[in-house]
Design a protein with these regions (language model features):
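Residues lining hydrophobic/aromatic ligand-binding pockets adjacent to catalytic sites
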Residues: 1-216
Length: 216
């Protein structure tokens, strides 16, 4: 199964719901979305729509270490997950979070804890990590590691979660050759389940073009 969506709602939610059946909610990274907003999303979302939640930034700021701050942040996240019937959580490392043996162990312990609360747990290791360095630990914890298939190659696992950050950062868009290349890569893969999340400024248009190239 191939899922395509965006990081947040780049257009009004009612319009987004007409185009996609998946979104990675970004508001949960900064805090708890308003109760009215959450209820409206759930009410307006079509049948079969899936919400993933971006984990609280406090988790990364605390270095993924267990403690009261992380415990409180996770409790808030779980509350939103219950309202949206979300079973996927994505945790992003801060850009200055270094790759080290100690941090790999800490992240593994955190992912194991998160996996007891969410069916699918995803870790985006950030720019200082090679995804291959954390994948063994994440796999042991039952979690997925984010890759950019255009720059970091595809995942070798049957279930994969890709985030597309833009060819030159958040403010860039994918030109047609890049979309075509991404579609070629996607068509060649044999994942049982795979999710493609566009996170760049033109994510809505780029995700639609990718879906068209995939004939989805």
């Amino acid at each position: 199964m191939i899922t395509v969506g965006c990081a947040g709602f780049p257009v009004p939610a009612t319009r987004y719901f007409r185009e996609f059946l998946f979104v990675e909610v970004q508001e949960t990274h900064l805090g708890k979305p308003g109760d009215g907003t959450v209820r409206r999303w759930r009410r307006e979302a079509p049948d079969g729509f899936r919400f993933a939640l971006l984990g609280p930034r406090e988790v990364g700021q605390e270095g993924f270490r267990d403690g009261k701050v992380v415990e409180t942040a996770m409790k808030t996240l779980l509350g939103v997950a219950k309202e949206l019937e979300a079973t996927t959580a994505v945790f992003v490392a801060p850009p200055d979070f270094p790759s080290s043996r100690a941090n790999r162990t800490i992240v593994k312990d955190f992912l194991q804890m998160a996996k007891t609360k969410f069916d699918t747990v995803v870790f985006d290791p950030g720019p200082l990590w090679d995804p291959a360095d954390i994948e063994p630990a994440a796999t042991e914890a039952g979690a997925l590691v984010v890759r950019d298939p255009l720059n970091q190659g595809p995942s070798k696992h049957p279930i994969a979660y890709y985030r597309l950050p833009g060819p030159a950062g958040h403010k860039s868009r994918y030109e047609d050759p890049a979309i075509e290349r991404l579609a070629e890569i996607a068509k060649s893969l044999k994942h049982k389940e795979v999710t493609y999340v566009f996170t760049n400024v033109d994510m809505f248009a780029d995700a639609k073009r990718f879906r068209k190239a995939m004939k989805l």
